């Protein structure tokens, strides 16, 4: 998932970079790339933006799919069903993601041929996505399912995301889009894709890898309560928008006349937003409560998980692996636990570690100030921040940093016998 996402990034983000550069020249130097005066074209911006913008949706969702593909097999106690088809489906999604952007322009006069082509590609991209849904369902089939907080998010994701996906296919029909375009139906579709698809995955992954990051687990009862509140809040907030959108409620308007009849649906959506907010408040409280009261005496592998990071202590040491693991299968740690063999062979060796540095965040701070100054034409501040940014780069380039070394003895002492013992499956 990460590999394919980064390939999309390599091809998609240069388009956005060029578009933003052209917009900057329009604002600061009086060019007319996007202004209709002197031969510019505003639709050029729309096309450049969405050539990046729609692959960006898959830049968001593919890592989330990877998280679900890690969590669901762990708590179903089964191998991921159809691993090769899952990979192939992601490849197809990444390719098709560059050929769907013009579905945002069905109603803007681009012609029947263009509308037909992009309608086909938009509906076609649902096929590999649907394959992934069925593979997750087949992974759950006959599995020994454990309903933990990460698994609850993953299970709730499937029906809610399917609602968002099916309505996306509806939006892909160019003829019907004249009814949907710029209505609350579109808003509901987007949020029913992004919240279950991305936000649920982030929350599931946060809960799942929290013990590996910090050495203690988040409270399960509070975690499940938050998951249910967020799922219910999502449905209550956005399902009414499908109805009001089909009834003609336009988006991007701050108020509506009472005579439109949208008041009831908007009030229900408001209640759903409140439920969503309560769910996120519970998550924040869970972090506070668990940080203060949770036990720090947890095993390296509290979930009985599958991937290699669970073979090292929790929280993970700075050097990660004291010995390089021997990987012979796709789920090497899972296989090692089943066979009773160790992943780690050979002697401890000295590890060279870099020193800590504040240069990256300082450079990023200068770059933030530079962008702010350029937007508001604060030229002196822009020059100072630009010099500061390049100064950080130059300093970092020529900084002598020999780092430090961790001896084999130190590592053998840090790695307890717990590392070599595996939970029974």
Question: What residue spans do the PLM features occupy?
Answer:
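...captures the hydrophobic TM-helix bundle architecture rather than a specific catalytic motif
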Residues: 1-417
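Single conserved hydrophobic/aromatic residue that forms the stacking wall/gate
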Residues: 415-425
